[in-house]
Regions:
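Cleavable N-terminal signal peptides of Sec/SRP-targeted secreted and luminal proteins
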Residues: 2-21
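Alpha/beta-hydrolase-fold enzymes
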Residues: 16-20, 156-160, 169-310
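Short, surface-exposed "cap/lid" segments of acyl-processing enzymes
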Residues: 24, 31, 36, 51, ...
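Conserved alpha/beta-hydrolase "nucleophile elbow" surrounding the catalytic nucleophile
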Residues: 81-83, 162-171, 333
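Alpha/beta-hydrolase active-site loop
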Residues: 132-157
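Short beta-strand/loop motif that positions the catalytic acidic residue
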Residues: 322-332, 336
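Short alpha-helix in the alpha/beta-hydrolase fold that links the catalytic acid
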Residues: 326, 340-349
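Catalytic active-site module of serine/aspartate enzymes centered on a nucleophile-bearing elbow/loop
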Residues: 354-395
Length: 395
């Protein structure tokens, strides 16, 4: 079952037809602008920023070639991708279907984030990707360093508060970052797709098995620090989870839940870009969330927690610290086995504000970014939310 691979917690673009040879295909990565945006006829510029801990990240700024001049240009919008994805996920379908293009066509100043470790953000001032120290990070670092630096940079360049859009892990990062006043004060509003701050009700069969089998500890024992699904070693390791244990014939559903509107005919094309690498530490942190039912910083164990945090347990990210005045919009689905409805409801109960909600019973985790009908089902509502915020915006 060499097809399994794109599985692990990913929420990407796989179906039962995917094979190992497909997954191991080389990526055409030059730059996101050159690969995906310019060929569609859109304006795109590459930007580079450096985080406080030395990672070199790529940002892209995208504009429509024919903006609707009857509409006032909207404020800048930052799109933050999910786990094992990069900014390319917002442009993988046609301009009429992809959120990055759709927002640009509505006159928004579109910025695209790519976290450390992805093939667009594979640099560091002193470390190489072959150094284990390069991979010593989890989603809390993506929130506190990567996302915080992106928001600061866009805020400075655009001279405006920004609209923040996150999907999956991008929402985990957003929730954590928005508990920090210095980040929240630069954000006009947030739109979160498949919002996650808690994961203890995950029911995806393959994810449950990986947690039970302690896959995170297995890869550490193998001396691995990077999760790269284009490597033979990881393909074989993840493949073994299905052998004789469970039915993995529909890999995407076993990870994310059933997706109603995913375009399976484009898998070959998607796999030219996805999946992107992440770190073993990041996977371990996500597994900690599932096991402990917490939204907390990375748990190093009793002694190192004391040395790192000054307490025996890692500090929680308090959703109550997100400003009640920050407008939020959330889209979630009844078929999503990662952003489970029970966990979403817990998140809502702890937020000081009352976000606007879009619930789609038939939508799974991937539908919110790759559904062929997402423009009508999801994106038009998000854009209405953003435009309503402009009435009180200083932009």
């Amino acid at each position: 079952m060499k097809r399994l691979l794109v599985a692990v917690l990913t929420a990407l673009t796989i179906s039962s037809a995917v094979t190992q040879s497909h997954i191991l295909r080389g990526s055409p990565v030059n730059s996101l602008c050159a690969d995906l945006v310019h060929p569609a006829g859109y304006s795109c510029t590459e930007h580079t920023i450096q985080t406080k801990d030395g990672y070199i990240l790529a940002l892209q700024r995208v504009a429509s070639p024919t903006p609707n001049l009857t509409l006032q240009y909207g404020p800048p919008v930052l799109l933050q991708h999910g786990l094992f994805m990069a900014g390319d996920v917002w442009f993988l379908d046609s301009p009429k279907e992809s959120l990055g293009f759709v927002l640009a066509d509505h006159g928004f100043d579109v910025w695209v984030g790519n976290v450390r470790g992805t093939r667009y953000s594979y640099g560091h001032v002193t470390l190489s990707e072959t150094d284990k120290e390069f991979w010593d990070w989890s989603w809390q670092d993506l929130a506190m360093y990567d996302l915080a630096e992106m928001v600061q940079y866009i805020y400075s360049v655009a001279n405006s508060k920004i609209f923040l859009v996150g999907h999956s892990q991008g929402t985990i990062m957003s929730f954590a970052a928005l508990t920090q006043p210095r980040v929240a004060e630069m954000v006009e509003a947030a739109a979160l797709l498949c919002p996650i701050s808690y994961l203890d009700h995950v029911t995806a069969p393959l994810v449950e098995r990986m947690v039970f089998m302690h896959l995170d500890q297995m890869v550490v024992a193998l001396g691995m620090h990077q999760i790269n699904f284009r490597s033979d070693t990881l393909v074989k390791l993840v493949d073994s989870l299905c052998e004789g244990h469970m039915d993995c014939t529909d890999f995407l559903s076993s990870i994310t839940g059933k997706n109603c509107c995913f375009n399976a005919s484009r898998i070959e094309y998607y796999l030219d870009y996805e999946p992107h690498p992440s770190s073993v530490k990041n996977l371990r942190h996500l597994f900690q969330m599932i096991r402990k039912g917490s939204f907390a910083q990375y748990d190093y164990g009793f002694l190192k927690n004391i040395l790192t945090y000054g307490t025996s347990k890692p500090p929680e990210f308090e959703l109550g610290h997100i400003p009640a005045s920050l407008p939020m919009w959330m889209g979630y689905g009844g078929s999503d086995l990662l952003a489970d409805v029970i966990d979403v409801e817990r998140t809502l109960s702890e937020l000081p504000s009352r976000p606007e909600l879009l619930y789609l019973e038939n939508y799974g985790h991937i539908d919110f970014v790759l559904s062929t009908s997402a423009k009508e089902d999801v994106y038009k509502h998000m854009i209405q939310f953003f435009r309503a915020r402009k009435k009180s915006s200083s932009w």
